[in-house]
Amino acid sequence: MAARDAGPASGPARRPNRRPSRQPTRRKRRAPDPIKAWVKRLDRTRPDLVRDVLDALASIHGRPTWERRLDPTSELILTILTQNSADINAEKAFEALRAAYPSGLPAERHNPGRGWGGAGLPDGAPPDWDAVERAPLEELVEVIRPGGLPNQKAKGILATLRAIRERRGDHSLEFLADLPALEARDWLTSISGIGKKTASVLLMFSFGMPLMAVDRHVDRVAHRVGLLPKKASADDAHDYFLAMLQPEEVYEAHVNLIRHGRLICQARSPRHELCPLRARCRFVDPAAP
């Protein structure tokens, strides 16, 4: 008997060859930058607000000109001493550092400018930062006690000086003058305990870099007028200001917003009758243009 035809061998079905798709790969859309979006919205819905605010503040506070305040390391330590303390008390603590750890270097002048809330430091040499870093914690606490919060600040000062020396070999921060502003800020904020505000104060007042330092006065005035979104934190505010201000406007804006917050736009009892911003202030009138 003839054998039956077994037919084709069984196995997995072969897929037909397909030509590769020529459609381009769809790129993921980037989320919009909230800071740039806010600035564009502000320009569209409240035109000339930034310019009007700067001009109004200048009409009563003048147009300050930049002058180097202190060497950068002294500026950094003085800024740490001002945290949650009055400027005049920070001056007392810094003077105590000068007296306890004299460096013998030439005296330098403190140019506090209009944004400073103290009397200004007398001329004097910076402290010996090597000696400060080597000081026992308990000793340093007592030296800076006039500035307030001495335990917290002494630890911060020692840690900061140590971090700078370990990275640079000494305590000088003059090298920051050669870096782009944001790169210099990033270098400083990479040190534990130094935030955008402290870094911006140092870079603005020691080198004239166009970095906005946002303290409670700047933050309060800007939120009340409507320059910043309601939910913007003080930390975020640094970058909002950089997006809305020209570099040559930053120093004037910082100094005059601080003065306005201290003298007129006070936290508890703002003096609306004296305020040149009231026509455009959303705190006075939520519908202000």
Model-derived segments and spans:
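Polybasic, lysine-enriched low-complexity intrinsically disordered terminal tails
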Residues: 1-42, 287
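Catalytic cores of DNA base-excision repair glycosylases
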Residues: 34-289
